[in-house]
Design a protein with these regions (language model features):
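Immediate flanking context of iron-sulfur cluster ligation sites
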Residues: 5-21
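ATP-binding/phosphotransfer module of carbohydrate and carboxylate kinases, centering on a glycine-rich
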Residues: 15-19, 28-168
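Short Cys/His-rich Zn2+-coordinating modules
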Residues: 2-6, 77
């Protein structure tokens, strides 16, 4: 092996989609990266805050809805964007899981901020459509190290290469 981790962001969800820097078309990150979702949320709300803050606001809105309270127009617009993101994420995960048959999907980096509600929806869609659905369920979990998971994972991969004599 190369010691490289999987790059889910470059799983194509549209063969004729938006050109990606990797050379492919329709890569997931061109539709649902935190930067893309943040920009869509900014356009929908007129608010210029970071992705994590929008996720926190949506988490609060979901609690509000759970208590039977009505959503504001702003919250409804945000839900449309998060729900669209969920569908696209599930689409990419279905292709990924059908190809690699992982034990679980771990969401880290900026994805760690995504409200659990939407990750549970993505997990439900994944497990209704993935090829192994009759035999097992693939959970979607948040990375233990949260937003630092990418940095820690890269450090671990580098240290593994050093200790295995690959870089010395």
């Amino acid at each position: 092996g190369t010691g490289m981790i999987c790059e889910l962001g470059h799983t194509s969800i549209d063969w004729n989609g938006i050109p990606c820097d990797c050379g492919n078309r329709g890569c997931l990150e061109k539709y649902i990266s935190s930067d893309i979702i943040e920009r869509r949320l900014m356009e929908a709300t007129g608010d210029g805050k970071p992705f994590a803050a929008f996720c926190s606001e949506m988490e609060d809105a979901l609690v509000k809805k759970e208590k039977g309270m009505e959503w504001t127009e702003r919250e409804k617009k945000m839900d449309v964007i998060f729900s669209d993101m969920t569908e696209k994420l599930a689409c990419g995960l279905i292709s990924f899981c059908n190809s690699f048959n992982p034990q679980r999907v771990i969401i880290g980096h900026e994805g760690w901020w995504i409200p659990d509600y939407y990750l549970l929806q993505a997990e439900e869609i994944l497990n209704c459509r993935q090829i192994f659905r009759k035999y097992r369920k693939i959970p979607i979990v948040k990375a233990f190290f949260g937003t630092e998971s990418t940095r820690i994972g890269c450090t671990g991969a580098l240290l593994t290469a050093i200790f295995n004599g690959g870089l010395i």
